[in-house]
């Protein structure tokens, strides 16, 4: 597909699951995308930046989305500490 300037553009850009690395298809209506804001540690205010995470419907259906998000956020330095014991 082309825009008004004649440049070729994609209509659909597939997302990748942050937890499993799977491609999230266009028809995966159970998939979610989360934007987690960057917060200044001293003032507690949002700095304007954010990190985006996508979780596929497959991970959500297994009930593993909370563990996966905690693992990813700990890896990226957003969360600190060990995973909570259930």
From Swiss-Prot:
Name a GO molecular-function annotation.
structural constituent of ribosome
Q: Where in the cell is it found?
A: Cytoplasm, Cytosol; Cytoplasm; Rough endoplasmic reticulum
The family note in this entry says: Belongs to the eukaryotic ribosomal protein eS21 family.
Which coarse location class describes where this protein primarily resides? Answer: cytoplasm
Q: How does it assemble?
A: Component of the 40S small ribosomal subunit.
What is the name listed in the Swiss-Prot or TrEMBL entry for this protein? Answer: Small ribosomal subunit protein eS21
Which UniProt key words apply to this protein? Cytoplasm, Endoplasmic reticulum, Ribonucleoprotein, Ribosomal protein
Origin organism is Suberites domuncula (Sponge)
Q: Does the keyword S-adenosyl-L-methionine apply?
A: no
Q: Which GO terms describe its cellular component?
A: cytosol; ribonucleoprotein complex; ribosome; rough endoplasmic reticulum
């Amino acid at each position: 597909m082309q825009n008004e300037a004649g440049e070729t553009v994609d209509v659909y850009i597939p997302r990748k699951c942050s937890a499993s690395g799977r491609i999230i298809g266009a028809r995966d209506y159970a998939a979610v995308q989360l934007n987690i804001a960057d917060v200044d540690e001293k003032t507690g205010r949002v700095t304007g930046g954010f990190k985006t995470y996508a979780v596929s419907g497959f991970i959500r259906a297994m009930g593993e989305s909370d563990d996966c998000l905690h693992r990813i956020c700990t890896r990226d330095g957003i969360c600190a500490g060990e995973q909570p014991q259930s």
